[in-house]
């Protein structure tokens, strides 16, 4: 059920353009990272507090591997004075409120709405986000240096991505089985779609997405070219013989 929702609801074009646009400048990347920091902090705080039989076992099993807010705080510190210098924007605040509302409803009825939010963000990170670390460094060097962005690094869990994703799918299915009714399962699906809409709002809030994405792509190309120029030059045959 959730897998089909992912395919139908995931606006890959907007996600891709929004991510590319975040590479247009260090300042724009800082704003994007701050938005993700605020979103993940809200989501992980709600997951930490969750007692629903559909949510708590999932987070108990995977929270240590999936948690991103600590890494995002470090990434933000690389490019901004503090998170307080980038408070939540209106779109980010709306997203945070939706997450908190989902957690409150789950607390009331034992539902699994928070699973929908976790599904949206963590699968995006595992399926695509891990491949964005190097492009981010190329585009924004030297402000974003080696070993960063940290929030794309899932350690051993990410290194075994296929097996980890299969375990996550199994856990989500178990969460669905723990829900008491078809209506409760449908509420999770609706929350996934809501989470996607909030992500699109955050990714596009700053505007100029296409031009920002083009600038980000240009920064990436320039960064790759600079990296190649800095590589040690192999000696020509005549030089080696001299």
Question: For the regions a protein language model found, what residue spans apply to each?
Answer:
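Metal- and O2-centered redox machinery and metal/ROS homeostasis
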Residues: 1-242
């Amino acid at each position: 059920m959730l897998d089909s929702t992912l395919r139908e609801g995931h606006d890959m074009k907007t996600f891709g353009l929004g991510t590319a646009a975040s590479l247009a400048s260090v300042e724009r990347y800082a704003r994007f990272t701050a938005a993700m920091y605020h979103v993940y902090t809200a989501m992980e705080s709600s997951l930490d507090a969750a007692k629903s039989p559909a949510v708590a076992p999932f987070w108990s099993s995977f929270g240590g591997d999936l948690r991103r807010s600590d890494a995002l705080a470090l990434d933000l510190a690389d490019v901004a004075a503090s998170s307080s210098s980038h408070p939540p924007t209106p779109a980010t605040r709306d997203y945070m409120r939706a997450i908190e509302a989902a957690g409150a409803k789950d607390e009331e009825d034992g539902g699994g709405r928070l699973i929908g939010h976790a599904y949206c963000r963590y699968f995006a990170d595992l399926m695509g986000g891990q491949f964005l670390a190097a492009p981010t460094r190329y585009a924004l060097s030297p402000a974003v240096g080696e070993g960063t962005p940290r929030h794309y690094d899932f350690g051993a869990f990410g290194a075994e991505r296929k097996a980890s994703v299969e375990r996550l799918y199994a856990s989500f299915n178990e969460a669905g089985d723990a829900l008491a009714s078809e209506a409760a399962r449908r509420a999770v699906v609706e929350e996934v779609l809501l989470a996607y809409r909030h992500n699109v709002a955050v990714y596009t809030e700053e505007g100029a997405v296409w031009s920002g994405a083009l600038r980000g792509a240009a920064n990436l190309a320039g960064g790759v070219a600079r990296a190649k120029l800095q590589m040690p030059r192999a000696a020509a045959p005549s030089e080696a013989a001299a």
